[in-house]
């Protein structure tokens, strides 16, 4: 149970933040409307969507944010794609087969074209998989493809691109050879890291291919406009292989970093949806905007990463002390109140073919006992009233971190730690995390594919920039390597759980809570199906005509 005094202390710590948030909301209420809404052509269906942040790039091999993926996934389709439920279904590959040892995968491509009419071929995939792994591409996601034979060597410049385990057997047959069995490959194949890019266009214009006007798609939409700070406009691709099944003709995706303003824009009918909701507003919105709030269990975790290059965080006792002294129940139940669950493990519940490792023993202790143990560990490490531990926490300025980070700061003050909060826009924050320019980082991770490895690989030595804290443990790496080599799903899961348990004890990260996905969607939008990976391809959307109280997005004919 959370004591009243505990709540009072945390709310006092949150005071300034809440005052500022209230002021921001008040200003939003009186502010002028967002960017003007372009007209929808007669007879067409148009959707206006809030997309949280401004994309940095629409190059699938260089993007890192979910706000970019929400655009790219509607432009480019890999060997597989997501259905309405977020599950892997055939994409460019109509079917595939694997060798008996699980190492060689053969994909048979459908007849499909780029938006300029040029056929999509196996050579496009060979070119693309080589491109993302080339050192000069500097893809921060490259390590997710290290399961492909020689991928790591190519990415590190130790082998030529031709050594990569991919080849075009014919224009419509692609072969991928892996280092180890990977039953999750069809899930991974829908991720933007495995998206094809048009080789014939890059041969002609190079890196300018990604600009609107040059960009070629093989998916349901093409990008026609990108007005910085305003919107990205997607238009239905008439050459998409299932264009006749795509209902929405145009989509405008707006950066909506101000969640309060985005909420009001949805309420006013300026936006048909927004890809986030302030957690502590969910109950209110369910009452005031019935049918709009969409929440669902989500394969995602919010956590803190400790920079192992900072002297204080080289000491396991310091990391453990900080991890155990956070009151996660207060954060999820009193602050966020959006259905999030306190996290004491790193892999979320619901991941396929996996049972999470047992949480640390302290997870079941009362907060007061955890605080006492944390003070003892800090004292052993040389910190106390005469030598307090001091550091900065860099965090995102998105709605939820703005709520819970002051509470964590207050938790650590209770054990004698002086932590200073430094907030940044999400893109800037993550750039700092990837360059390891932080002491403690507030981060979040969403599964790229439904498998425990999508989470556990983050702390692997070879992972690179996404291993924010630069954690390195040979024993952890060895357990993941054993899991990679294992064909038996149950034995593999056991190795993964051992690795997770080892990592939790080492505490290079402190899990805070498991996500729920939160979308604000007009009831008139159909085909938007809540799912565990929060993937919503626009090819399945439509607009129900005559929805009560809804803005009419379907322009009249004539």
Q: Where do the model's predicted regions map?
A:
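N-terminal lobe/hinge region of extracytoplasmic solute-binding protein
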Residues: 50-100, 130, 214-217
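Periplasmic-binding protein-like
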Residues: 133, 185-188, 294, 309, ...
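Structural transition elements
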Residues: 342-380, 398-403
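Extracytoplasmic/peripheral linker and loop segments enriched in polar/acidic and small residues
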Residues: 31, 166-167, 332, 367, ...
